[in-house]
Amino acid sequence: MSFVSKTIIEADHELRYLNGAELEILRAYLNSSEKRIKVIKTLRDREKEIISKASRKLFQIHPDYIGPGGNASGSRQRALCLRDYGWYLRLITYSIIAGDKNPVERIGLLGVRDMYNSLGVPLIGMVDSIQCLKDAALAELKSEEEVKLAEPYFDFVIQNMAQ
């Protein structure tokens, strides 16, 4: 659910108009729409470079993952790892435009711990991988304002995987 929808539903649940504070928050959100779109376009257009930088960093931190018997030792396993990077980056862009963590939570995090555990993927590696993805993605953004729009959603994914 988008930030706008959530705000409206909360007010309607209380059978009231949006108050002044809510309207100001909505104004700020709507005024940030161009920046949000710019951030999403940057992340989308630079996806390959972001994933490449993030994976290099992850495999520096955990060289055993690409060593014999590691979770990303073969080309197929490595391709799946890179696919997951792209998947999380895309889901984070959904949350950026919505102004809400719900898209990444609902689509990307429900049941993720169980799934990775069942596949034998170390959760610490997933936490580190999203941290590397965050670092690579935020490095592509041009301003602190853009970073502030994207960073909370990366942090949300990291925190949820770390629990």
UniProtKB/Swiss-Prot annotation:
PANTHER family: ALLOPHYCOCYANIN ALPHA CHAIN, PHYCOBILISOME 32.1 KDA LINKER POLYPEPTIDE, PHYCOCYANIN-ASSOCIATED, ROD 2-RELATED. It comes from the Eukaryota. Belongs to the phycobiliprotein family. Its main location: plastid. SUPFAM superfamilies: Globin-like (SSF46458). It comes from Cyanidium caldarium (Red alga). It is found in: Plastid, Chloroplast thylakoid membrane. InterPro entries: Globin-like_sf, Phycobilisome_asu/bsu, Phycobilisome_asu/bsu_sf. The gene is apcD. One of its GO terms (cellular component) is phycobilisome. This is Allophycocyanin alpha-B chain. Contains one covalently linked bilin chromophore. (2R,3E)-phycocyanobilin binds at residue 81.
